[in-house]
């Protein structure tokens, strides 16, 4: 709109014209605004139509999309319903499965606890069984040890019984021999007393001759020449049957003194033999195998019959009075039968048990019962002994005696250690008990039984 030209007249502010002008100006402004608003409205209507069309198109499209979405929603809802059902079913199934598994786990736990308890009980029972087994093994070993000790004690006692029987026989023989030796000693004493009396009578007759003439003295000398001759020292000198052969007085006195010393030695030895005879004792049951073995060794190392036989044989050689009782017969009578030798094992290793591996009782074989040695069997198996060493006269006989077994053999023993040699097991005679060595001279002949006493050269008085 164009502006309207107004006259240039001064107007007052409160004048009518001025107000009309103002109102007219406002009218013009309002009209312009209305036109502008109409134009804007038209534009707005056009744009709104376009917008409405677009919106309608969008609405149709959105309706289509909504329908599609609703269809999809319905499909999804159906799917959700199905999945819900499936989830519920799966949940129910999982719950049932979980309950079943829980029940199974609880049952397995109970079974595991039961198995643990059974295993614990089994282990305890196994420990008890092992302990019983150990106790049984130790008891069995103890019983076996006691059984072996009992077998050893039985074997040792059997050996002691056999040795006791042999010693009893030897004791009886020794008593008889001592009795015979006592009789021979008394016989020798009587002989020595008679000889001393004859010597004293002869000395008295020589020292105190009766008064006689020369003729009587010559006759007396001729009579005495056939019987005896007086020496310078005043001792009687025996003569032979052919002529008078004087004997040195020192030799005759030495013989007499030697005989006296031998008699004294014989008496002392007989007394020693009587005191050293073993007394028969009943063997007691050994407390242990070591004491039993030591007892057996004590029996073996005690004064044996070999020592007694040696003493008696030496006494028989010294006296030599009765030819009827010769040395061989005395040795045959006094020779002991071989006693069982129970040897011990080597103690250096600490072992004191006998070796019983060959025992038939351990191997299940019956033991053969054999008779005990008797006095007659001991006499029957006697062997002559050496009068000096108390052993068989020959080396072969000594070996045979060492290896000979007793009448009652201990077949249940198999001894590993060798027995002591006979020379070591024999007790040595003290030097004082040995007879005095006589002067080397020809031994006088033994008198015949029942004959009178004879002098040094065998002449009867």
Curated annotation (Swiss-Prot):
Residues 21-206 form a coiled coil. Residues 288-297, 320-329, 410-424 have a biased composition (Low complexity). Residues 366-379, 391-409 have a biased composition (Polar residues). One of its GO terms (cellular component) is kinetochore. Keywords: Coiled coil, Cytoplasm, Cytoskeleton, Microtubule, Transport. Self-associates. Interacts with PAC1. Required for nuclear migration. This is Nuclear distribution protein nudE homolog 1. The gene is NDE1.
